[in-house]
Amino acid sequence: MGINEIIMYIMMFFMLIAAVDRILSQFGGSARFLGKFGKSIEGSGGQFEEGFMAMGALGLAMVGMTALAPVLAHVLGPVIIPVYEMLGANPSMFAGTLLACDMGGFFLAKELAGGDVAAWLYSGLILGSMMGPTIVFSIPVALGIIEPSDRRYLALGVLAGIVTIPIGCIAGGLVAMYSGVQINGQPVEFTFALILMNMIPVIIVAILVALGLKFIPEKMINGFQIFAKFLVALITLGLAAAVVKFLLGWELIPGLDPIFMAPGDKPGEVMRAIEVIGSISCVLLGAYPMVLLLTRWFEKPLMSVGKVLNMNNIAAAGMVATLANNIPMFGMMKQMDTRGKVINCAFAVSAAFALGDHLGFAAANMNAMIFPMIVGKLIGGVTAIGVAMMLVPKEDATATKTEAEAQS
């Protein structure tokens, strides 16, 4: 049994615990029947429900872009392919740079990869779980949640996170190379050359984004927000066209992928968008309760991380929450000290969703890549913390130290 299978078994263990809690909550609660242990698992049933209800949000984000993937590859290919080949990289890296793995990046990467499975997985699942989500999701969502005065800390944190994405990608690629990833019994050939050469365009983009966030942060952040709005419009167009094609047979956009199983598809080998979403939700039934219960059971050691990083408990809790979803963390930012704000935003660039949606997506689509993806995301997040600690303005760092001393 490999590490990827072990991770799946652990999540299913937590899924069963959460299912028990949901059942017992109908009759007075887990504590009533299971005593102290029951009290420790209360609330996991609610996370069980959250995991399944995520299907709707996932569908809105994924289905349209998944259907559009071959169309976008056909339109963008003539421009993207020559540029990336000139840099010595596979064109699939374009997809993971701009799109999250679960917002079309994985499927567009496959279309652009030209049959190179390793490059497809490297972009679609490793890069596409770090840079893509930051640009199309995290920054636009954060702007709608955080206080306007915290935008400068968001920019600093994202800057720290972006520049360490290549480190996380290389780490994930090396784990994939040494763990012997296989698809349908066939080995996927990750090589040093592939891992390093495909980082060239990523490093260029990371440097440009970092320079923009350093010198024109407001304009860069607003630019990401505008890009995200256009992306939502494109995804909605694709979703509407795909549904019309499925229900009426009208092909409003030629070349769309089916969103349900089509004639010729082999069950278990080919999964279309709707089935993929269902599979992700099944994984999230266990992933969400797992994060809740591990956070509760290991609260003291997790909170001690905050002391090591010299930030308050709210900031430490935000980092833990980020591993499942970064939206709660952004909601907590106004209660964090300055150092904690920058560190959390930096950590979220790579590490967000590592034990949430991205874990569910990898498990549903390519479970051989679960461990490489998680390792890459965590190393990217941890190294981003180191950079963030150097970027906190001196006057703010002094204020943070005073706040930390007051807490203790």
UniProtKB/Swiss-Prot annotation:
It is a multi-pass membrane protein. GO terms for biological process: ethanolamine catabolic process. It is found in: Cell inner membrane. Keywords: Cell inner membrane, Cell membrane, Membrane, Transmembrane, Transmembrane helix, Transport. Its main location: membrane. The keyword Zinc-finger does not apply. It catalyses: ethanolamine(in) = ethanolamine(out). The chain crosses the membrane at residues 1-21, 61-81, 89-109, 126-146, 155-175, 192-212, 230-250, 274-294, 313-333, 342-362, 369-389. GO terms for molecular function: ethanolamine transmembrane transporter activity. Pathway: Amine and polyamine degradation; ethanolamine degradation. GO terms for cellular component: plasma membrane. It holds the Pfam family EutH. NCBIfam families: PRK15086.1-1. Probably involved in the diffusion of protonated ethanolamine (EA) into the cell at low pH. At low pH most EA is protonated, and this permease becomes necessary. Belongs to the EutH family. PANTHER family: ETHANOLAMINE PERMEASE EUTH-RELATED, ETHANOLAMINE UTILIZATION PROTEIN EUTH. This is Probable ethanolamine permease EutH.
